[in-house]
Amino acid sequence: MANKVDVKELLDAGVHFGHLTRRWNPNMAPYIYMERNGIHIINLYKSAAKMQEAGDALAKIAASGRKILFVATKKQAKEIVAEQAEKANMPYITERWPGGMLTNFVTIRKAVKKMASIDRMKKDGTFNSLSKKERLQVDRLRAKLEKNLGSISDMSRLPAALFVVDTTREHIAIKEAHKLNIPIFAMVDTNSDPREVDYLIPSNDDASKSISKVVSYVADSIVEGLSERKSEKSTKKKEEKASKEEKSDKAPKEKKEKKAEVPSKDAEDKKAMKEAKNDVKLESKSETLDKAKASNEEE
């Protein structure tokens, strides 16, 4: 379960500041507390409840071993999102959203593989065999791919969810996620439509302090889910080991069969055995003669 949200901390971070009243989206009305100086003020108690709800859901996704893709291309959110996504070991997009990132994921994966292929060329020496012009072109291509796709190089399949900062700006990512039924978690300001996302966090998506507060909470929830998964795996391994040991202890031990004595191959032992056999034969012969002699005397 995600950590409890402190409303005072949200207030200090300026999470409650919305947009100008003339730029509002009527669908955000349930999350607006009041209007002050022509600006809408977000209800922080509702923001805290929604943050908790989103945090719990994201922790469960992380605990299942699936990836959550962070999306934020606006200037004031880039560095914050990149830092927090890396902390949670999750992929992220902070540069221009590549068209078809989700709906044409196969092509995106090919571009990522191309990047890995260039790295292999540099390792095995193939790169050095190219002309100076070709090396320059390959380096430029590698730098471009790294800038746009380097942060998703570990994402081998479609993400289980998206976390978005500013749904109005990232509308293409939202549309692609809708087509593939990928759940969307997002910071939603008073000028955006909350119906576009599955888990909204009513919040100021323009101020860096507000973005940092919300995104760090989300990242911490994901880290918590990952640590839960790790501990579950560890417990499972211990249980399996204990079960195997218990079975081996209960299994009946096989009785060792006594092996028949093998005749000695030693020369002296053989000689002794032969003499013993002869003594037995002589003894039995003398007994037979004595018995015959005795019977004759009786007659």
Swiss-Prot record:
GO terms for biological process: translation. Residues 227-299 are annotated as: Disordered. GO terms for molecular function: structural constituent of ribosome. One of its GO terms (cellular component) is cytosolic small ribosomal subunit. InterPro entries: Ribosomal_uS2, Ribosomal_uS2_bac/mit/plastid, Ribosomal_uS2_CS, Ribosomal_uS2_flav_dom_sf. Belongs to the universal ribosomal protein uS2 family. This is Small ribosomal subunit protein uS2. The gene is rpsB.
